[in-house]
């Protein structure tokens, strides 16, 4: 009788342990929501400055400026913060804080803010995320904190992080943000010294690649032409090639953040991609 009871107890404990292990290992639900963070006031003649190979003559495009909210279980990450309202003709009429409010998310709930690079159209609304850890490429952070930052580095956008000594994680390598492979900051230098892109793995849609300014529009991504203002041409070409290989291997959806034609690859706000 005692032996049977002991075996029963052992069996119950084993089943409970298996159940708890399965529960602990259950993947967090991941969603991705695009937030409008500005749009071009006028079309841009991209054949002048956005290629060094004469790849697209007389091509004019209207740029868009995108921010993103990633929900990982009960945790949140923001990717890029666009222009601040009122700071540019391209700035959004509604700021990111108010957009997050529509999603019932406060800035204080955001655990990470990832920045593709230090330009003002990606860093204009950093200040409200007081509890977040800033994820930024090492090369870009070095410029932001340099006594003589390079032209185009939006030092003012990072003022609160520097003055208040907020949490910063400069990235010299790729970063698995939540530790389960679902959200990875990818090193894609070239546009700036520490430029990064983002991989988000979604259960239904599959992997999504957010390019930052690795490429500014589809023709830029496909032709191999490099904007004249990029920091490093060779690094840009290598990073684009890396992105193409990742996209092919993972069968990922590539979202070029400035290309208005790519907005429709994700659900319209406030709906998330899942």
What annotation goes with each model-predicted range?
Residues 6-19:
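Bacterial N-terminal signal peptides
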Residues 20-105, 109, 160-163, 173-178, 205-212, 248-253, ...:
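Metallo-beta-lactamase
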Residues 80, 117, 191:
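Conserved G/P- and acidic residue-centered "switch" motifs that form tight phosphate/ATP-binding loops
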Residues 89-136:
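Active-site metal-binding motif and surrounding structural segment of the metallo-beta-lactamase
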């Amino acid at each position: 009788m005692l032996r049977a009871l002991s075996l029963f107890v052992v069996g119950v404990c084993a089943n409970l342990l298996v159940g708890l292990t399965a529960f602990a290992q259950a993947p967090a639900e991941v969603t991705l929501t695009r937030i409008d963070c500005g749009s071009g006031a006028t079309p841009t003649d991209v054949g002048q400055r956005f290629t060094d190979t004469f790849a697209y003559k007389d091509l004019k495009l209207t740029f868009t400026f995108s921010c993103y909210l990633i929900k990982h279980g009960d945790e949140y990450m923001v990717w890029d913060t666009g222009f601040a309202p009122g700071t540019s003709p391209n700035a959004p009429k509604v700021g990111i804080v108010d957009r997050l409010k529509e999603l019932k998310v406060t800035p204080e709930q955001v655990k990470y803010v990832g920045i593709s690079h230090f330009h003002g159209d990606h860093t204009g609304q950093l200040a409200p995320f007081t509890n977040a850890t800033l994820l930024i490429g090492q090369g870009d952070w070095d410029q932001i904190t340099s006594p003589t930052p390079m032209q185009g580095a939006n030092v003012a956008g990072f003022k609160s992080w520097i003055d208040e000594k907020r949490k910063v994680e400069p990235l010299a390598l790729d970063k698995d943000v939540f530790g389960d492979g679902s959200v990875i900051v990818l090193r894609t230098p070239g546009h700036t010294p520490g430029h990064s892109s983002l991989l988000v793995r979604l259960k239904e849609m599959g992997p999504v690649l957010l390019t930052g300014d690795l490429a500014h529009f589809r023709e830029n991504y496909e032709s191999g032409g490099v904007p004249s203002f990029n920091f490093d041409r060779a690094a840009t070409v290598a990073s684009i090639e890396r992105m193409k290989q990742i996209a092919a291997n993972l069968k990922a959806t590539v979202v070029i953040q400035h290309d208005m034609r790519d907005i429709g690859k994700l659900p319209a706000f406030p709906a998330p991609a899942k």
